[in-house]
From Swiss-Prot:
Tissue-level expression: Expressed exclusively in endosperm.
Name used for this protein in its record: Protein MATERNALLY EXPRESSED GENE 4
Annotated S-S bridges: C53-C75
Family from the record: Belongs to the MEG family.
Signal peptide stretch: 1-27
UniProt source species: Zea mays (Maize)
A Pfam family of this chain: Meg
Name of the gene this protein is made from: MEG4
Recorded superkingdom: Eukaryota
Sorted UniProt keywords: Disulfide bond, Signal
Length: 76
């Protein structure tokens, strides 16, 4: 009878741990999607380097661009 309780406890805690990691992994994926939606191009602080004044913030790249169109294309 005591052996049965230990097995039940082991199964319970294993499932609890599995649920925790599944929820944690799902939360990270959702954060990545939300981060992509928050991307934007902004004018950087003067002076501009090589006439590139637009910066991508929160997107795929952190480079500088000379036009807003270039920045938007690379950032999103």
């Amino acid at each position: 009878m005591e052996y049965r309780k230990r097995v039940d406890a082991l199964v319970f805690f294993s499932l609890l741990l599995l649920g925790y990691f599944a929820a944690h992994a799902h939360g990270k994926a959702k954060e990545g999607i939300m981060q992509g939606n928050g991307a934007r191009c902004v004018v950087g602080f003067p002076p501009c380097k090589d006439n590139k004044c637009y910066c991508c913030i929160g997107g795929r790249t952190h480079a500088r661009y000379s036009t807003m169109a270039e920045c938007s294309h690379a950032c999103f």
